[in-house]
């Protein structure tokens, strides 16, 4: 496997040359500044993103479906405390971890999602189970947990999700609220759902993946722990088909990351697909348009997309987004900061 390529996503390509990418992933967007990132943490992110890409690529290389590749890549990120999904999920206001995920098949438009689950190790696996083994698209809370466990998804005790960094973030935000220095919708400069970041845009974080298999089928998935200090059963865009995740072989596979309320209002993932289908935009132009529209609404975050020809769109309006892609030959490209 190749080393890290820290070059711009928009690096020039020789005339007539086309690199076909088979997977693109993200690990959250936010104020990710090189000045606030230690070399050790930066390396840890690069290694985790590369491991996720490799896991997905291995599925594709072996001839498995793009859905399997997406699930495998997201499993790696869910199992890492670095990302706000699975093991690294943030805490709600009452000190719990409530996780959301969704997955979609571009060939059939079938989809599955779970929201507000508290004891499932890998929520993306539960979303896949909902898609494959039920007549439903979304299941929530205890019902989703019972269904997922009955269909082979691993369960864990609540203590599995505890990380000191996430707990400390919650305590800082609660302290600010109690002293009147922060309301729920304020951004706490010291609290982050995205490890290794500083400044604004820090309550949220998500992981996502889009894959293109040997049969030419696309799949997309997204998983998250939501917003730090979220309250009262809040659900963001990650499990919402059309907002956090959308996939259609006719256009692209898409996964979002950012302030979920804005992505729901924009119906961001479907908006990107519609711009390609109805306006004839390329995948990267459509991604750029969606992020521009979200920015004008007052939202921030990023989006990744992959079309059937292996073209990638990666756009964000924050200083950084953990992201990467791998081409059909297994060449890995990893990016963190705005290039």
Regions from the language model: what does each represent?
Residues 1-2:
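Sec-dependent N-terminal signal peptides
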Residues 5-8:
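C-terminal motif of bacterial Sec signal peptides marking the signal peptidase cleavage site
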Residues 12-339:
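Alpha/propeptide regions of enzymes that mature by internal proteolysis
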């Amino acid at each position: 496997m190749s080393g890290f390529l820290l070059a711009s996503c928009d690096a020039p390509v020789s005339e007539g040359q086309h690199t076909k990418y088979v997977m693109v992933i993200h690990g959250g967007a936010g104020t990710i500044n090189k000045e606030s990132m230690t070399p050790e943490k930066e390396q840890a992110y690069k290694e985790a993103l590369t491991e996720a890409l490799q896991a997905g690529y291995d599925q594709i290389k072996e001839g498995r479906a793009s859905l399997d590749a997406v699930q495998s890549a997201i499993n790696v990120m869910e199992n890492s405390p670095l990302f706000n999904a699975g093991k690294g999920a943030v805490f709600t206001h009452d000190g719990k971890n409530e996780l959301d995920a969704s997955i979609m098949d571009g060939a059939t438009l079938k989809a599955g999602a779970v929201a507000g689950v508290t004891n499932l190790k890998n929520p993306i696996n539960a979303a896949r189970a909902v898609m494959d083994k039920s007549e439903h698209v979304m299941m929530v809370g205890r019902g989703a947990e019972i269904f997922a466990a009955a269909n082979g998804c691993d369960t864990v005790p609540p203590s599995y999700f505890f990380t000191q960094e996430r707990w400390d973030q919650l305590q800082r935000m609660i302290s600010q609220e109690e002293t009147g220095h922060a309301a729920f919708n304020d951004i706490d400069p010291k609290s982050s759902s995205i490890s290794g970041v500083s400044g604004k845009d820090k309550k949220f974080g998500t992981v996502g993946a889009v894959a293109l298999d040997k049969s030419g089928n696309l799949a997309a998935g997204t998983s998250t722990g939501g917003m730090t200090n979220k309250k009262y059963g809040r659900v963001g865009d990650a499990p919402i088909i059309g907002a956090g995740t959308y996939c259609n072989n006719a256009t692209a596979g898409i996964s979002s990351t950012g302030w979920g309320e804005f992505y729901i209002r924009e119906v961001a993932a479907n908006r990107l697909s519609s711009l390609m289908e109805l306006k004839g935009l390329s995948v990267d132009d459509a991604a750029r348009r969606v992020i521009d529209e979200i920015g004008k609404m007052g939202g921030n975050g990023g989006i990744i997309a992959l079309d059937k020809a292996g073209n990638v769109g990666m756009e964000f309006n924050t200083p950084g987004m953990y992201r990467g892609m791998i081409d059909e030959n297994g060449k890995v490209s990893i990016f963190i900061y705005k290039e």
